[in-house]
C-alpha cells in the first residue's frame, strides 16, 4: 500500500506540474506587448530600457556597472533623465510622448528614442 500511495502521489505531482507549466503563463503579459507610457512612466521606461541597453556590454564581460553598486547614483540618474527627457527622447519631428503616450508602443519602438550618449 505504501508503494502504490507513493506512486499515486508522484503521478499527481507530475500532473500538477505539467498543468501549471502549460496553463500557468496563459494570462501573463508579453514583455514586448505595446503599452501606453505617459508622465513618470516615460523616464522610468527610459531608465529601464535605454540604460540597460547601454550596460549590456559590461554585463557580458562580467563587469558590474558602478552605478548599480552605488544606490544613490541610480536615483540621481532618474532625476537627470526626467530633467533631460526632451533632449534624450526625441526622434526626428515626433517625440516619445506623441508616439507612446497618445498611442501604445512596444519596448522595441520605445528603444528607438534612446539617446546615443
Swiss-Prot record:
Give the modified residues of type Cysteine amide.
Answer: 114
**Gene Ontology MF term list:** hormone activity; toxin activity
Q: Which SMART domains match?
A: IlGF
Broad class of the protein's primary localization: secreted
* Signal sequence range: 1-24
Where does the record say this protein resides? Secreted
Keyword field: Amidation, Carbohydrate metabolism, Cleavage on pair of basic residues, Disulfide bond, Gamma-carboxyglutamic acid, Glucose metabolism, Hormone, Hydroxylation, Secreted, Signal, Toxin
Q: Which Pfam families match?
A: Insulin
Report the residues modified as 4-carboxyglutamate: 98, 109
Name the organs or tissues of expression.
Expressed by the venom gland.
Positions bearing 4-hydroxyproline? 34
Q: Do the record's keywords include Signal?
A: yes
Q: List the disulfide bonds.
A: 38-101, 50-114, 100-105
A GO-annotated cellular component: extracellular region
InterPro entries attached to this UniProt entry: Insulin-like, Insulin-like_sf, Insulin_CS
Q: Keyword Glycoprotein: yes or no?
A: no
GO BP terms: glucose metabolic process
Q: How does it assemble?
A: Heterodimer of A and B chains; disulfide-linked.
Q: Which family does it belong to?
A: Belongs to the insulin family.
**Protein role:** This venom insulin facilitates prey capture by rapidly inducing hypoglycemic shock. It is one of the smallest known insulin found in nature and lacks the C-terminal segment of the B chain that, in human insulin, mediates engagement of the insulin receptor (INSR) and assembly of the hormone's hexameric storage form. Despite lacking this segment, it both binds and activates human insulin receptor (long isoform (HIR-B) OF INSR) with only a 10-fold lower potency. In vivo, intraperitoneal injection of this peptide into zebrafish lowers blood glucose with the same potency than human insulin.
Q: What is this protein called?
A: Con-Ins T3
Amino acid at each position: 500500500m505504501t508503494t502504490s500511495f507513493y506512486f499515486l502521489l508522484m503521478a499527481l505531482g507530475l500532473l500538477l506540474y505539467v498543468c501549471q507549466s502549460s496553463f500557468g503563463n496563459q494570462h501573463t503579459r508579453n514583455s514586448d506587448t505595446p503599452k501606453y507610457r505617459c508622465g513618470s512612466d516615460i523616464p522610468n521606461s527610459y531608465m529601464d530600457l535605454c540604460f540597460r541597453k547601454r550596460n549590456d556590454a559590461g554585463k557580458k564581460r562580467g563587469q558590474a556597472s558602478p552605478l548599480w553598486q552605488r544606490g544613490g547614483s541610480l536615483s540621481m540618474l532618474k532625476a537627470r533623465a526626467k530633467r533631460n527627457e526632451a533632449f534624450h527622447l526625441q526622434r526626428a519631428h515626433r517625440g516619445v510622448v506623441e508616439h507612446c503616450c497618445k498611442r501604445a508602443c512596444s519596448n522595441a519602438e520605445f528603444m528607438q528614442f534612446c539617446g546615443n550618449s
